[in-house]
Amino acid sequence: MRVLRIIAAALVFSALPFLSTPPAQADTSRIKDIASLQAGRDNQLIGYGLVVGLQGTGDSLRSSPFTEQSMRAMLQNLGITTQGGQSNAKNIAAVMVTANLPPFASPGSRVDVTVSSLGDATSLRGGNLIMTSLSGADGQIYAVAQGALIVNGFSAQGDAATLTQGVTTSARVPNGAIIERELPSKFKDSVNLVLQLRNPDFSTAVRVADVVNAFARARYGDPIAEPRDSQEIAVQKPRVADLTRLMAEIENLTVETDTPAKVVINERTGTIVIGADVRISRVAVSYGTLTVQVTESPQVIQPAPFSRGQTAVQPQTDIMAMQEGSKVAIVEGPDLRTLVAGLNSIGLKADGIIAILQGIKSAGALQAELVLQ
C-alpha cells in the first residue's frame, strides 16, 4: 500500500502600508567568535591505513584485493614473510584517515582523526587503527595517527534479520594523531593582519573596524583597522605593539553583529530554521490536503486439477482519494514570535509549512532569503 500526500497552497499577495516595528535587540559577540585570522587557518590532512581487531566485520579480501595487498606490505615491513595462498581473514579493513591540522600547531600536540571504511567492511566497532602517516596537499607528512576507534552506531545480525542504527563504517579516534612537523608561519613577522568574518556581512565588517579603531585610538592614538569588503578587515600593527598581545586584546572586543534574514529548509528531514529578522507581508493562504491511497491486492489463479495449465498472478489495484476541506488563513509576521505563531495556527505538518513558505517566497511576501538543503 502506498500513500501519496499532496499539499496544495494558493497564495494571494496584498500590498500593505509600511508597518513600523520596534527594532530587535542587537546581539553582541566577541570578535574571536565571529571572525578568524587569515594567517591562522586549518589545513586538511589525509592518509590510508588499516584497522585490525574487528570481530568478523572487516573486508572480504576477495572483494577488496587492496586490503590484502596492504596487509602483506605491512607484514613485510615488520619483517614477516607472507607467502602462500589468499588469506580469508575478516578482522581487517582498509580505511581512509582524515584530520584537520590547526593553525600554529607544534610538534608533539595531538588532534582528532576520522576513520572511514574503504572496502566492504560492515562495521569498524572494536577495531584499532594501525600507525598511519597523514600528509598535506604538498605531499609532506605532518602527523601520524594510531589508536582505538570509537563508533557511534551499532549493528546486530542474525540468520534472518539485521538491525543497524547509525553509521558503523565511520569512526573517530580522539587525540589519535601526533603532530610531527610544524607548518611554517609568518605571524610574528607580519605587519598587516586580516580578519575574516565567518558570516560575511558589510554591516558587521564596518562595526568590527569601528570597534577596533576606537580601541586603537585610546591605546595607540591612531586607527589601525579598515574594512575591505563584507568579509575581510585589514588591521595594521602599530610599531610599539606586540603582535600576539595585540591580537589577544582585539579578539576580546565585543561587536554588535548583523546577518541577512534567512529561512533554511531541509526537505529530507523536514527541518525549518527561521532567522530572527525574517518578515512576512500579509498574505492569504488557501491550503488543503489530498491523500491518495493505492492498494495492491494480487490474486493467485490456480489451474484445474490434472491439467497442463500454469499458476498465474492477476494484479488487482484499488485507488482511493480523500481530500480535506480547504481553508483560508491570513499569515503575517512583523516579528519572529508572531510569524511562528501564525504558521503554527494553520495546523499543518512540516511538509505543509515548507510548501507554504516556498509559495510565500514566490509571491514576493517573504522578506528573507530562502535556502533549500
UniProtKB/Swiss-Prot annotation:
UniProt main location, coarse: periplasm
Any Pfam family: FlgI
Range of residues in the leader sequence: 1-26
Gene Ontology MF terms: structural molecule activity
Annotated GO CC locations: bacterial-type flagellum basal body; bacterial-type flagellum basal body, distal rod, P ring; outer membrane-bounded periplasmic space
Any Gene Ontology biological process: bacterial-type flagellum-dependent cell motility
Subcellular location: Periplasm; Bacterial flagellum basal body
Keyword set, alphabetical order: Bacterial flagellum, Periplasm, Signal
Coiled coil residues, start to end: none
Keyword Signal in annotation: yes
Protein name listed in UniProt: Flagellar P-ring protein
Function: Assembles around the rod to form the L-ring and probably protects the motor/basal body from shearing forces during rotation.
The protein's assembly and partners: The basal body constitutes a major portion of the flagellar organelle and consists of four rings (L,P,S, and M) mounted on a central rod.
Similarity annotation: Belongs to the FlgI family.
Protein's UniProt keywords contain Cytoplasm: no
